[in-house]
């Protein structure tokens, strides 16, 4: 999360809660797939760059937990397991599968790439499609990575690291203080197979095969005991001609309005910005 985002967390009074879970990387390093350093950002922890709003890396679940903690004093009620079956865009109001109806001054449709709200607005189903890109993620416990390990520098010097190669790129960063998240975004093309909605368990050897000739550091991390591999499909949606209702009281935001493929893993920010 860049300072523009954490500054808002600060204004909302939840930054201290986020900091309980977040990591403050020192820099971002861009490498070739073989490990050669191509470019390095200035130290993102430098107070002259980030002022009082830090650059953070945080697990999404921990971020949501912190945001949830800040809702109690603002009269926010969160209803889980609520299936929306109908939206009246003029009132505006929505109806749940239970028959309950809720009216509001404005409704924001933020239900992701498989948005039901988008289909309601367009008047027809509008499913996302896969261009053939997939994500492999390995979560590596760093507790047993010692000074003798080739990946020690990634643990000792907290940073966001990118490796860029043919057909894909990898990004790594620390989460939960002692877990290294390694994410491979890979273009498998038309042969990507059956779409996988959301992370599903995958064979670590499948990940290894994709990066067989990449930096040895990556190979060693894949082999750390306790590493867990998951995989899912990336989706896009067709470009929308409209994402708001003419009444001005309903609008789509986030992936419901503009799901796109990641570019060097800046992907979460387009959806975070309108949501914030």
Role assignments for model-derived ranges:
Residues 20, 27, 35-38, 219-220, ...:
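C-terminal helical "tail/cap" subdomain of flavin- and related membrane-associated enzymes
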Residues 44-51, 189-193, 235:
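Short glycine/proline- and charge-enriched loop/turn segments
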Residues 1-70, 74:
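Active-site-adjacent segment of FAD-dependent monooxygenases/related oxidoreductases
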Residues 57-58, 101, 130, 269:
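Short aromatic/basic micro-patch
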Residues 34, 65-226:
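Conserved FAD-binding catalytic core of PHBH/FMO-like flavoproteins
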Residues 108-109, 172, 206-207, 228-276:
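Conserved mid-domain beta->alpha element of the FAD-binding
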């Amino acid at each position: 999360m860049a300072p523009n985002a954490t500054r808002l967390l600060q204004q909302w009074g939840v930054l201290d809660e986020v900091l309980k879970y977040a990591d403050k990387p020192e820099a971002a390093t861009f490498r070739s797939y073989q490990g050669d350093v191509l470019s390095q950002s200035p130290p993102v922890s430098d107070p002259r760059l980030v002022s009082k709003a830090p650059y953070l890396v945080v697990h999404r679940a921990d971020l949501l937990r912190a945001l949830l903690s800040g809702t109690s004093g603002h009269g926010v009620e969160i209803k889980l397991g609520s299936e929306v079956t109908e939206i009246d865009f003029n009132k505006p109001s929505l109806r749940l599968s239970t028959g309950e109806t809720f009216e509001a001054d404005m409704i924001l449709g933020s239900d992701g790439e498989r948005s039901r709200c988008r289909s309601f607005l367009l008047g027809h189903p509008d499913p996302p499609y896969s261009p053939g890109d997939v994500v492999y993620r390995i979560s590596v416990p760093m507790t047993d990575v010692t000074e003798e390990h080739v990946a020690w520098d990634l643990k000792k010097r907290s940073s966001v690291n990118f490796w860029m190669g043919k057909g894909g790129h990898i990004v790594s960063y620390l989460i939960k203080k002692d877990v290294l998240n390694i994410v491979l975004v890979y273009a498998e093309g038309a042969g990507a197979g059956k779409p996988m909605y959301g992370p599903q368990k995958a064979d670590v050897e499948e990940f290894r095969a994709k990066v067989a000739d990449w930096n040895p550091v990556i190979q060693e991390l894949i082999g750390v005991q306790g590493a867990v591999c998951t995989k899912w499909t990336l989706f896009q949606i067709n470009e929308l001609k409209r994402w708001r209702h003419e009444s001005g009281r309903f609008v789509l935001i986030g992936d419901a309005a503009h799901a796109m493929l990641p570019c060097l893993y800046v992907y979460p920010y387009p959806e975070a910005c309108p949501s914030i």
